[in-house]
């Protein structure tokens, strides 16, 4: 037990204290605490340390065979004793991250109403739009500093899950704490229940959300704005992370609010930041620069285009012109390569097209330019998948890429595992062990010709906890593109492969708290440099990061009046 910090004064006692997850210690309450807080007789006689509690919890966890059962078990601990939950997860982060987040959280979102046990966070439904202020005041957390909000329309690669999407904000905020040290007392998951267009949810008698098709257009925009304005009044300094909004809303919401409040979209900006960081590490390992690469994307939605824009910004920072950088990026969607004369291009796609005059010089069978056509003609050195469609990185595509690139960089990033564009084993086999691979979901190391290849998980959890920690540490007022770029560079500096010439592209999850601290420092420094946070010395920034880094230790309690 960590008694270094001053005691907490608690206004609860008896069963109410045991039913408060942020404060409950279970069998770790001391003799004095049991007496002062009316807990005598409510707990077994033994007084245990958090280490003993964690060992028991892990033994129970190991008895479950199915990942979903493990997820439900961990969520139950989280809703009972949050300190124990985070100690358990931190002790087994590599094993448990896939359980509390991707890929298992996807299935948990699909089955949310059926596995529901206890409310967590806020469910803000459209029929109650006139009472958003009251709902925020009802939150169990009063000093909220980080909000993750979704409307449940684009959950991972699984589509519209309605309020089932709440599993994502809950999981993301668990990682803010486990990876980034942000106190769970400062976090709030929110789902905006605007209905669902998923017929399975609407017809499911167990579905707990608003049983209505989704609102859209001005009604939707007004509802989201009412929520944002209410948050600004209740918690004016809170960081808001937009999560898993559909393509048609994700970019417009980000553009509308990024210069008005402290916010970012993790699917667009967080994914871009971790991908750029991984690419910088891969380029260093391949003894090249990002500005020298030719990059092909499969998937030209808001996430793919967000990554592309971040890559272009980094390439320009390395000394090439923006026009040159854009000419080296090839966006492929379901209709083929994006070309400037194509109809119905989305606003955020228009700056990422190739010129028809350029494509006319290619050797093509017809005007529909496929990914394989891009491989044969543009000869990309980097291939990034954000399509959500499994198997599209075929053997022909990967072998064609390897034919002109000795060390191809291949990132099949779609989540969950069932949606990945190609498995790492196939990519490594098809390139005879030469590909540099990172994936969006966790994969076991690949053995090829007697050599073991660890697979980096290019997961946003390497980025967003550190961004949040840096913002909180220096009270940054905005999240800028430059702050995100700083996070990418800091992540790249942690790459074992880039540093040592062997190992994975990204550091092991066991080091993720160190990585988050490094990213937090880089983000905080950039925020100060840009005038988005009060001035602080480097030493003071580090002190503030330490002061904000929550530890999963029990505090001593003192009784206050109640």
From Swiss-Prot:
Annotated HAMAP family: NAD_malic_enz (MF_01619)
Instruction: Name the cofactor(s).
Output: Mg(2+); Mn(2+)
Descriptive protein name: NAD-dependent malic enzyme 1
Q: Which InterPro entries does the annotation name?
A: Aminoacid_DH-like_N_sf, Malic_enzyme_CS, Malic_N_dom, Malic_N_dom_sf, Malic_NAD-bd, Malic_OxRdtase, NAD(P)-bd_dom_sf, NAD_malic_enz_proteobac
GO CC terms in record: cytosol
The record's section on Gene3D superfamilies has:
Malic enzyme, N-terminal domain (3.40.50.10380), NAD(P)-binding Rossmann-like Domain (3.40.50.720)
The positions flagged as active site in the entry are: 101, 172
Asked if Metal-binding is a keyword of the record, the answer is yes
Q: What is its EC number?
A: 1.1.1.38
Q: How does it assemble?
A: Homotetramer.
Q: Which domain of life is it from?
A: Bacteria
What is the catalytic activity of this protein? (S)-malate + NAD(+) = pyruvate + CO2 + NADH; oxaloacetate + H(+) = pyruvate + CO2
CC cofactor note: Divalent metal cations. Prefers magnesium or manganese.
- Keywords assigned: Metal-binding, NAD, Oxidoreductase
Instruction: Identify the residue position(s) of the site Important for activity.
Output: 267
Query: Can you tell me which residues bind a divalent metal cation?
Result: 243-244, 267
Q: Which GO terms describe its molecular function?
A: malate dehydrogenase (decarboxylating) (NAD+) activity; metal ion binding; NAD binding; oxaloacetate decarboxylase activity
Q: Which PROSITE patterns match?
A: MALIC_ENZYMES
Q: Which GO terms describe its biological process?
A: malate metabolic process
Binding residues for NAD(+)? 154, 267, 415
Chain segments annotated as transmembrane: none
The cross-references to PANTHER family, in alphabetical order and at most eight, read:
MALIC ENZYME-RELATED, NAD-DEPENDENT MALIC ENZYME, MITOCHONDRIAL
